[in-house]
A protein has these predicted regions:
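ATP-dependent small-molecule kinase phosphotransfer cores
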Residues: 41-100, 104-106
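P-loop (Walker A) phosphate-binding loop of NTP-binding proteins
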Residues: 14
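Short beta-strand-centered segment that lines the nucleotide-binding/catalytic pocket of NTP-utilizing
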Residues: 32-44
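The feature captures the helix immediately C-terminal to the Walker
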Residues: 23-24
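Walker A/P-loop
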Residues: 19-20
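Small-molecule kinase domains that catalyze NTP-dependent phosphoryl transfer to phosphate-bearing small molecules
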Residues: 142-196
């Protein structure tokens, strides 16, 4: 019997919906690999280069683009200037050997689906009630040595458009996972993963 191909489980949702916490728990509890994305934004406190992101400057992005290795790239005009987030074909993915867990945006999910094929990607859309999400974002930003409240507000408003119901439907995302209760959300995600492949 032929071995099942791996999947790319694509975790996405609005900012402060709990994606990072769910991601860490899933990585600890399941034999999944990750695809570390790239960004031109500065490191946040507690982040490490090569763990959450590969932090490269604009010159690094230009070099990878010239080499034709960019799978998808999004650039946001922040109050601190343009910040790009992107995925690179750098040899991290081998679906014949493993399944992967990735955090990304709806836009990046669509581009990854076009690159790897729809059968390889499984969307996991996380949501939290907006008031709770805003409070979580504010609490997290207060912990930064230099809080960026204007950027927090920009992200919150941009998420409303980026993850609209219409855009989710157009991307073929029909299931969502409430993260009001992290344990329940984690259980539901694991059930989906088990159905999709043996992880």
């Amino acid at each position: 019997m032929e071995k099942n191909m791996g999947k790319i489980f694509y975790l996405m949702g609005k900012s402060a919906s709990g994606k990072d916490t769910l991601y860490r728990r899933l990585m600890e509890e399941l034999p999944l690999r990750t695809i570390v994305p790239y960004t031109t934004r500065p490191l946040r406190e507690g982040e490490e280069n090569g763990r959450e992101y590969h932090f490269v400057g604009e010159a690094g992005l230009a070099r990878l683009r010239a080499q034709g290795r960019i799978i998808e790239c999004r650039t946001y005009q922040t109050v601190h200037g343009p910040w790009s987030y992107f995925t690179v074909d750098d040899g991290q993915v081998n679906l014949a050997q493993a399944s992967y867990l990735v955090i990304g945006t709806l836009e990046s999910y669509i581009k990854m689906q076009q690159y790897y094929g729809s059968e390889a990607l499984v969307p996991i859309y996380i949501y939290v009630e907006d008031g709770e999400r805003l409070q979580r974002a504010l609490n997290r930003e207060r912990l930064q040595s230099v809080p960026r409240y204007a950027e927090l507000c920009r992200r919150f408003l941009a998420d409303e458009e980026d993850f609209s119901g219409e855009k989710l439907r157009n991307a073929g995302i029909t299931r969502s996972y409430s993260n009001q209760d992290a344990e329940c959300c984690l259980k539901n995600i694991k059930e989906t993963m088990k159905i999709e492949c043996e992880v």
